[in-house]
Amino acid sequence: MATPRLTRNSQQQNRISQGSNSRQTTLLDWKVKDKAGNSKSVLEESSSLEDSNHADDQTEDALQTAVEYFQKGPKKASLSKDSVLEKHLKTVENVAWNNGLAPEAIDILLNVALSGKFGNALSTRILKCMIPETHISEDSVVKAVSWLCVGKCSGNTKVLFYRWLVAMFDFIDHKKQINSLYGFFFVSLQDDTLCPYVCHLLYLLTKKENVKPFRARKLLDLQAKMGMQPHLQALLSLYKFFAPTLISVSLPVRKKIFFNNSKNLWTPALLAVKLRNQGIFPEPLKLQLGPTSGRSLKRKWNYHSVIPAVNSAKKECREKMSLFDYLSNDRSLPVEQLQSFPQLLENIHCLELPSQMSSVLNSSLLLHYVNCVKDESILLRLSYWLSQTLQEECVWYNMNDYQQEKEFINFLDMVIRVQCFLQEGFYSCEAFLYKSLPLWDGFSCRSQFLKLLAWIPFSSFSEIKPLLLDHLAPLFFTSSIYFKCSLLQCLKDLLQNWLLWLSTEAQVQPMTDSPLETTLGGSMDSVSQLIEYIGWLSMVAIRLESSSTLLVHFILDFYEKVCDIYINYDLPLVVLFPPVVFHSAFLSLDATILNQLCYIMYRYRDNLTAAKKKDLVQKAKSEFSISSKICKEFNYYLTALVHCLWSSRPFETGVYIDPQIIENTGETQYKHNLNFVHHPCLLNYAASFLLQESPEEMPVHLSSIRGKKWNWYLDHLYSEGFQGLNLFIKSSIDHSSVSKTEKNT
């Protein structure tokens, strides 16, 4: 039976028409510039276009002849002796690497390669040029896998086929039948040579229903036999994610790159297919066969070309649906027909996701779907793609090229928007940061790097300190105050994301069931250590920047989040700021800093009171008990504030100053110098209050603010926006002492 003619698909025709349109547009532009020779140029351009179409037809005929030859040709032939065979093989290679092969051609050539009818050398060359023009039929892959059971191909051919299958995974139009072969692939793990590549394929295929106890036991046996191999750890981690009770061994908590794709033979070809599918360029992209080198990756970055367009997996093969597809009750909605959020809600049960899952990142509607459905396999595939993109596509990134930097920033901004939308950080971004931070100068892509840092998933402090904080600390100490403030804001956002995750996990499921294998107490220890580390950074920064008002404001902004952990997040943790932070804020010359400090003290008091009440009511079941050290520290801060601001009795507890030193200053009324009236940051408010009360009195006497005027002055401060002072006074000062204070002041 003759092989049907391998015609180009509609997408290739569209590409040719796009090329025609682009030529016409260029011609019109040129026509305006040079009207004299336009007729001749039009004829030449039309002639060249006709020649190009004629050449395409000749190439198509040559490819059809070559494919028919391989399908019907002799069973055994030598490349060195058979010139016809070599000619047809070169034809297939040239077409594959320039334009890609149609699904029908791939179907035939896969059978030829895996049947071994032409020998191992030719099978290897055919597999290396199996590059799709647009997509690969699932039926072709299933038939190719069936040849593995016959034993006609060599071990090297099997390895190359699995490598090809992993590389082309996203271009296969369906995965249902391939997933039904999961058991066959799993059995192939017993082959030591195939094991790394089969693990990679299974990592892409595995769903929750594929995780079975006998398979978990087999993986554990393989690990005991082969040791802690990265590919086995990857599959075990995935199994443990879906079924934590089946995997009892400890695995690395930190996600990493388990599979090395740096030797992927088809990396340039895959990029060309993505660009071609989106119509980025009309002309074929000539690529070199072989592994990708670092130099060849230094191409122009364009994040639109990295992320494929949203297209249904069945878009290219709607006309070839089987009888089973027509009779099936499962009517899926192609993603390209999804136009509105109500339409998403109506079809959320039958939405057909694209085979290239990374295209989801460019669709807000599909991100809504990912967020609602919570399908772990989708997130895993997204994370896998992002991991490979960041680790391999971005290693060539040149910071001295402004255009590349701008496009790279746009790509990172897109990733950040997706993480904010999903309210979840990708482990692949975390691995990228850990790899990049040791080389980061603290300036390039600063905003993007810090935003990515804020979405690092929760983990123990002992793990992130050497990977993250130890690299950030030198930059923090040696950079400008603006970098210090930006990093403090980033760490505040990181803490907030951790707290939200922990509070949600504590409500949804016990912490012992979480993927991090940690108890609530262990999680709180990590959060506490992070806060204490940031407190240490703050103390050093205050000394380096001479208690800068801007810096102290960002530090207190961080502790506004810390002081409300118990009440706002329902987590058993209270951590106070260091004394250096307290005294720098209290002695600041900026009134807003003092107001912010009083508000934080008010919130600390509420959190400690709530924790104490719960501890007394449920003493036997108490989640935690407040240490006496925390209570003593808070009481010291509280007493210092009340004595200085209200009672005018500073330096009575915790601080001792030699009376001779005070006498040498010549200041006899020093006890009043830090109260609400005489505090350096409040002097202008006190003077303004007196001028409003008695405009004719000059000069003003601050000592006159006593008795009723004291209360009026406080009301004046409240009207100026000092609500932190107001809340602190109402919550921490005994109102029975007001009359006594009025007399003493």
From Swiss-Prot:
InterPro entries according to UniProt: CENP-I
A UniProt-annotated Pfam family: CENP-I
Location(s) in or outside the cell: Nucleus; Chromosome, Centromere
Expression across tissues: Highly expressed in testis, ovary and spleen. A much lower mRNA level is found in brain and lung, and no expression is detected in liver, kidney, heart, muscle, pituitary gland, prostate, epididymis and seminal vesicle.
Compositional bias segments (type: Low complexity): 39-50
BP GO terms, sorted: CENP-A containing chromatin assembly; follicle-stimulating hormone signaling pathway; mitotic sister chromatid segregation
Record-level GO cellular component terms: inner kinetochore; kinetochore; nucleus
Induction of its expression: By follicle-stimulating hormone (FSH).
Span list, region Disordered: 1-58
Biased composition (Polar residues): 1-27
Keywords from the named record: Centromere, Chromosome, Nucleus, Ubl conjugation
UniProt PTM comment: Sumoylated. Sumoylated form can be polyubiquitinated by RNF4, leading to its degradation. Desumoylation by SENP6 prevents its degradation.
Subunit structure: Component of the CENPA-CAD complex, composed of CENPI, CENPK, CENPL, CENPO, CENPP, CENPQ, CENPR and CENPS. The CENPA-CAD complex interacts with the CENPA-NAC complex, at least composed of CENPA, CENPC, CENPH, CENPM, CENPN, CENPT and CENPU. Interacts with SENP6.
Family according to the record: Belongs to the CENP-I/CTF3 family.
Name recorded for this polypeptide: Centromere protein I
Taxonomic source organism: Rattus norvegicus (Rat)
Gene responsible for this protein: Cenpi
